[in-house]
Each structure stands twice: as structure tokens, then as C-alpha cells.
């Protein structure tokens, strides 16, 4: 049995929960489906931000902007992350303990902020092997992010798996 991690962007889930219309080029889940995932023993739901998964706000994911003060960044990051956590609680009764960085973009302050908010793990887009030794090594985990348009065989070959 393998367990999947599904990382949810709160603003997208709010948008797609308003109707039964699905976007065929960029499918997304509704809050009722997120609830089903939380209660499924094979799925771990992660927080993928509330609204950092776009470049519309002049920010690269959840990364601190150049010239932005640490206090301003902290407020923006914590507000967005907490907004998502609050939506998870309101809509499903659960809150994630995993944070997945939008676009894999992060700053050196983010791990401490996530820990202070009760998160137990974070996922980057850095590729590589993780060596889990203690609770702290569950932050900034590497992963192989499979983009669209690549076959399963090519994806695994890239990792050296035949």
C-alpha cells in the first residue's frame, strides 16, 4: 500500500467548489473531495498555499520578494498560509500538517514560520534523495515533480529507475 500526498491550493478549491463545471486543462478538487481525501487512509492532504500558486501578485510562489522586509514577508506568508488552514478547517474539519511550496519557491525564513504554525513537513521541487534522520529532516524534502507531457517510462528513466 502506498500513500499519496495531494497538495491543495485553497483559492482554486474555493473557485471550483462553486460549480460542477470542471476545467479540463487544469483539473482541480472541490472541498467535498478534499474532505473525502482527509478521511481516506491512503491520502495525506497538504497545504499548497491559499493564493500563492500564481504569479499575478508579483511574487514567485511563497518566496520573499527582493527588498521586502522580513516583517512584511512574515505577515504575508503567515496570513496566506493561515487563510488556507482556516478554509481547510471550515470546509473539512481538518488542517494539513504538510506544506508544499508553490513553484518550489521558498525563503530561508519559511521553515521556522511553518514550524511555529504547527506544520510537520514541507515539500520543495528540488530533485534528489531524502535522508530522514529526525523530525527536522522532514522539512525541505526533495521530490520528483512529474510535469505534464512526459511519459511514465521517461519520468522514471530520469530518476534512474527502469
How would you label these PLM feature ranges?
Residues 2-107, 139-141:
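Metal-dependent polysaccharide deacetylase catalytic core of the NodB/CE4 family, i.e.
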Residues 89-92, 111, 115-149, 157-162:
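C-terminal domain-boundary segment and adjacent tail
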